[in-house]
């Protein structure tokens, strides 16, 4: 059974893709495939961050501390 990549693994992969795309020396088809992979990684990373944010808000709310915690979606 294969381990799921961690948040950090996905972020590192995204950084690598961005670096390769910035060089501009990849064939169009490869660049498009890399871009699609990058978009998928961004969505996964955003979901992970949102889930973590929601969990923190619940923990804080359950402890009756900062119950008016505002979450931002920047």
UniProtKB/Swiss-Prot annotation:
GO terms for molecular function: exodeoxyribonuclease VII activity. It is an enzyme of class 3 (hydrolase). It is found in: Cytoplasm. The keyword Cytoplasm applies. Its EC number is 3.1.11.6. It catalyses: Exonucleolytic cleavage in either 5'- to 3'- or 3'- to 5'-direction to yield nucleoside 5'-phosphates. Gene3D superfamilies: Exonuclease VII, small subunit. GO terms for cellular component: cytosol; exodeoxyribonuclease VII complex. Keywords: Cytoplasm, Exonuclease, Hydrolase, Nuclease. GO terms for biological process: DNA catabolic process. Heterooligomer composed of large and small subunits. Belongs to the XseB family. Bidirectionally degrades single-stranded DNA into large acid-insoluble oligonucleotides, which are then degraded further into small acid-soluble oligonucleotides. This is Exodeoxyribonuclease 7 small subunit.
């Amino acid at each position: 059974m294969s381990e799921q990549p961690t948040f950090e693994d996905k972020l590192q992969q995204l950084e690598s893709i961005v670096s390769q795309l910035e060089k501009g020396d990849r064939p169009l088809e490869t660049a498009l495939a890399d871009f699609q992979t990058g978009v998928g990684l961004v969505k996964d990373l955003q979901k992970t961050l949102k889930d973590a944010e929601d969990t923190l808000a619940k923990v804080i709310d359950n402890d009756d501390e900062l119950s008016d915690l505002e979450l931002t979606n920047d």
